[in-house]
Amino acid sequence: MRRLFLFLALLFAAMPAAAQYAPFNPVADYVTPGQDEPGYRYWVGAAPYRPLYVRAFNDYLVNNGVGGVAPTWQLLRTASDWQKCGHQPFEVPPTFAWPNIVAALRFVGAFIEPVVGQVEPVSVYRNPALNVCAGGAKTSTHLTAGAIDMVPLRPITRDALMLALCRIQLDKGSWNNIGLGFYKGLRFHIDSKKAREWGTAGPRGGYGCPAVLTENGIPYRAPIQIAPPILVQPAATLDPLAPRR
């Protein structure tokens, strides 16, 4: 045992200082300068109509009980390839699409965040031209703001995240018309279009959430049908970055 401790101490000492103390920051892999908080402040102040649009969107989320699920400014992030495509880093979705993001946020706030902790959206609405440039599907739910790509802010491994989200998806997502998808790393996708999944695989290579559970030794159970509650947020949870009246 003493030799093991000595080996670990030597291994830690040999690591670069940056690796020893690097904070857990999964957002850094998907958010470039200009799509961060300083970038949002610059963007929202660059046109006189933008604060009005953001305020209306923020008020709609609050009035529909999802104003505290994620900061409003993060829900305005477009695509990670915004700069390469020559588009805006943020965009307020068209009003016809607002109910779609409410449905997705309600599921995230009711079922996902209580399990994996706070999440940060990294891509939500994409206009048609940006969606094409970014390689999105022709029928992508991002076109109607019903999809949210996000990462967890609490330290977790990809396998543990996939297991947690697959349990939620099989228990509650399938009959709530929620789609679940996984990208590389910790980035995952939730949408309110229809029940489906992609990018999920068990540790032995089996496809889909049932394989994720069974290959981790967790038997699949029939879902308990519990509708997501309406999340009523107090006024104190108004987004601090949303423009004030």
Where in this protein do the model-derived segments appear?
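Catalytic cores and adjacent binding grooves of peptidoglycan-active enzymes
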Residues: 20-31, 139-148, 152-245
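Cell-envelope/glycan interface and biosynthesis
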Residues: 42-194
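N-terminal signal peptide c-region/cleavage motif recognized by signal peptidases
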Residues: 14-16
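Positively charged n-region of N-terminal signal peptides that target proteins for export
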Residues: 1-3
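N-terminal module-boundary/linker segments of secreted carbohydrate-active enzymes
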Residues: 20-48
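Sec-dependent signal peptide hydrophobic core
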Residues: 5-9
